[in-house]
Regions:
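Residue-level recognition of conserved beta-strand positions in structured domain cores
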Residues: 71, 83, 90-91
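Pocket-forming structural segment of enzyme catalytic cores
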Residues: 1-73
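Short, surface-exposed beta-strand/loop micro-motifs that present aromatic residues
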Residues: 75-82
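Acyltransferase
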Residues: 89-115
Length: 115
């Protein structure tokens, strides 16, 4: 694969023992890395924003330095990863209203700058 790691199904219960609904459907906050070195797109995004999810699995990247966004659902998981010319998210930006548009605008600007 392009990024090393695993993917696992969300457990039935979170770290606090509360039952998790799987699939995870709904809005959750993403905490973006504030390190400029993490990825150039992040400069255009607020430190935190809410995005829409529909998923039953979460990524477990081997290299934690690739994690640029984190969400909490039964515990923290990688919401976004980036490495060189790769930027991937676990949520649906196209369904995430204003936050999704900000992300897609930042992505388009970043891609245009790579020419």
């Amino acid at each position: 694969g392009l990024l090393r790691g695993r993917v696992e199904r969300f457990p039935d219960h979170g770290a606090d023992g509360k039952r998790l609904l799987v699939p995870h459907i709904g809005w959750n906050e993403v905490r973006w890395s504030q390190s400029a070195a993490a990825h150039p797109m992040l400069a255009a995004l607020p430190e935190r924003d809410h995005y829409y999810y529909v998923h039953s699995y979460r990524p477990l990247p081997r290299d934690l330095a690739t994690v640029v966004g984190v969400t909490e659902y039964g515990g923290d998981f990688a919401a976004a990863v980036a490495k060189q010319n790769i930027f991937a998210v676990q949520f649906h930006p196209e369904k995430s209203q204003a936050a999704g548009k900000r992300l897609l605008d930042a992505f388009a600007t970043w891609v245009a700058s790579c020419r």
